[in-house]
A protein has these predicted regions:
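Short catalytic-loop micro-motif centered on adjacent basic/acidic residues
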Residues: 41, 62, 94
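Active-site cofactor/cluster-binding pocket
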Residues: 45-80, 84-85
């Protein structure tokens, strides 16, 4: 759908960069990262990436991965301010998903439903805020290895969790 544009995160190693878009082969990435022994890192989209995605739209609904794990929300917030200052008649509804999982897709689908129903911009933003109060997904990580490799978890904690077969 041309109205839905992804602004991807990136996972990097000293050997390769993985861009989280439709061309990413997740199985290959997981296999390669599992065998990679070096340090990995993540990079959120920058303000320019968000501005490019906003394009020339009159209404933008920007959904970000949780601000507690990524700088995506902050970069999108700066882009929103720049966009609305440059184009005073355009609006950006910035949504911190407070999630790192499928909840982003649920929010997207709800926005599509509200747009299709003909709601105005402000109503949609308010409805999404209310909708988020009732959408909470819980998931479990099989391993903490990648989190340790990119500095988000102490490597000793990841090792102990693996030895004890603890899933978080």
């Amino acid at each position: 759908d041309k109205h839905i544009i992804s602004v991807p995160l990136k996972i990097t190693t000293d050997k390769k960069e993985y861009v989280d878009d439709e061309s990413l082969d997740i199985e290959v990435m997981i296999r390669e990262l599992a065998s990679y022994k070096g340090r990995s890192g993540t990079a959120c989209p920058g303000t320019g990436d968000w501005l490019d995605a906003f394009g020339d739209a009159d209404w933008v609904f920007a959904i970000t991965i949780t601000s507690t794990l990524s700088g995506s929300y902050n970069a999108a917030r700066v882009a929103k301010e720049e966009y609305e200052n440059e184009y005073p008649n355009r609006k950006v509804c910035l949504i911190d998903s407070l999630s790192a999982g499928a909840e982003l897709k649920l929010i997207q689908e709800k926005i599509e439903e509200l747009v299709a129903a003909g709601h105005d911009f402000d109503t949609i933003c308010n409805e999404i805020t209310e909708y988020q109060k009732h959408t909470h997904l819980i998931f479990c990580l099989k391993s903490l290895t990648n989190l340790a490799n990119n500095g988000r978890v102490n490597p000793a904690v990841a090792k102990i969790a693996g030895v004890l077969n603890i899933h978080v």
